[in-house]
Structures are given as C-alpha cells and as structure tokens.
Amino acid sequence: NTFKECYAQIMSDFDEALKYLPEQYTDVNEDQVPAKYAQKGATNAEYNRAFGINHRGKIDGRIISAFKAQLAILAASPAYASAGVASYEDAAKYAANCLSEFGGLDAVDPDGWKWFCNKSLIDGLGATSENPKEIIWRGNVEESNSLETDCYPPSLYGSGKINPTQNLVDAFPMANGYPITDANAEYDAKNPYQNRDPRLAAYILVNGDKIGATDGVVNSAADSKTLDGLNKENGKSTKTGYYLRKLLRPDVNLNPSSTTKQKHLPARIRTTEILLDYAEAANEAQGPKANVGGANYSAYDVIKAIRKRAGLGESGEDPYLEECA
C-alpha cells in the first residue's frame, strides 16, 4: 500500500472510533446518558459499566484526537508531503481540535514540565483518577525502579545507559532566553551550567550534580576517581560526560542493602507535544503570529507560554523570542 492509502485508512479508522468512544471515560447520572444510548433504553448504570471511570486508561476520544494530530503533522512533513494527503493547515486544525478539549492554550500546565518527579501528584493518582492537566494518555502508575536501574550513574548502582550528548546540552539556552552562542547570552564557558534554562538542570545530570535518595554527588569528569567518570567502565560509565535525569525519580535508592521503589507516571502523550505540533504546523502554514485551524492562538503564543512556564526571559520579558517573531 502507498502512504496515501495508509493515511486514508488510518484516518478512516480514527473517525469510526470517534463515533463510539466517549471523549473521556466518566460516570454519569441518569439524565446525562448520551441520547443515542438513552434512546435504546440504556440506564446510567449500564452506560457507566461500559464507559465509566473504571475504564480510564483505555483509548478514548481525546486520545484519538491526539493520534489524528500526530498523523497529520507527520503527513505534512517534508518526508511525506509529496503524497499530498495533508497540509500544514490540516495539521494545525487537527492539533487545535485536540487541544480544544483541554482549553486550547490553557493546556499549558504550569508544572507540566516536571510531571515525572512531582511526588505529591504521582502518589495521589489511582487507576480511576482523572489525568493531570499535562497528560492526554498515560500508563498505569506503579512502583518500580527499573528506569533508575537503567539510567542512574554507576556510583548509585545504576547502569548509566542513556548519555545525553553535548549538542543537546548546548541546545538549552541561557535563563535570559538567548542561545549560548548569542552575544546577549552572557554565557561563561568556564561555568557552562550557570544561569541556564532551568530545564537543563531538571532533565540532564551534569558534573557535580546530586541525585538519588542519598543525594550522591556525581563526578562525570574525565579525571573522576569514581566509575561515574568519562569512559571509566565500559557499558556503565558515561561516554559523553552526562547522564539522564528526565523521567527518573530522584528519591529511588538502588543500594542493595536498602533498595527502594517509587511510583512513576508514564506519560504516553502530553498536551505539550500537541501544543508543539500545532506551533510547528501553524508557523509553517502562515507564519509565527497567525491563528490557524480554528484556534484563537498562534505558534508564537504557544512558544511564549512554554518558555514562560520554564522561567525563561528577564524582568517578565523574552527579548530573544521577540527578535525571532
């Protein structure tokens, strides 16, 4: 089958699913049973048995809308645009439609960029809990330490499997919003991690950082006296000078004498992802400040909100973003 045929079939399947799936699994009262089921004599007890909160975590209408946005931005991309099945305007429309279920631009959750280590939030989630604002689709919240076992540095009994690269670290701007290569960045090569985008410290473990239940200091330098150092032990020590922090619970202890597990929130689709899909599509379609696809916000509005959430800018302004827009 061609890409065009596959795209058409997948979108058709999504549309068919939307005819039957609720936007969100929730219990209803007798007078809230959707008309198409009430007309067939369904009671609220029967409706709730099929579409109630006990089914949360399964595919619902909001997840399908997110799938459509993901597929459309893929189809509009340079890799598949020649198939002619979706434009960037189409992709923006699908993303905006999905986001409308979450308040549009209000889908930007102030704490959403740190969802994976929000202990009080995660510990309060049950199987039938409503998703946090940041999350469209998630897996079950369960106690584990497998991510930490894979990714903690070896001094903390981890395998150090994921090593962020230098170009990823360099992509994080300064706290004032400017790229580190910009003359206005005030970047200090001798203190490369000072005054950086707060997301750098939240997502990547750099030399001298602390992590783990015992707050162990990680020395990932080439002259490190520990196994955390650059290329100290094949298969465990970092090959780049960095270790992953994102997705990990910093309160997990892997010490064999006092091993602990913690609950994890596996986010499969986040509202931030769909917001960025919209921003990309809207910008490509009509530029940074156009409202596209029925949305009342632009690519610029999305990027500004996400950067502001992370704490970028100075004195409440984001001069670098204004230069770009």
Q: Which positions does each model-derived feature cover?
A:
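An aromatic- and glycine-enriched ligand-binding surface/loop that stacks and positions planar moieties
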Residues: Y7, F14-D15, G52-K232
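Short, glycine/acidic-rich hinge or "gate" loops at secondary-structure transitions
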Residues: Y25-Y37, A81-G84, V108-G112, N291-S298, ...
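A conserved hydrophobic secondary-structure block that centers on an alpha-helix together
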Residues: N1-E5, I10, Q24
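Short, intrinsically disordered, charge-balanced linker/junction segments flanking boundaries
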Residues: N1, A76, G316-A325
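Charged, glycine/proline-rich intrinsically disordered loops and linkers
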Residues: T26-G52, L227-K236, P319-E322
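C-terminal substrate/ligand-recognition segments
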Residues: Y193, P198-K308
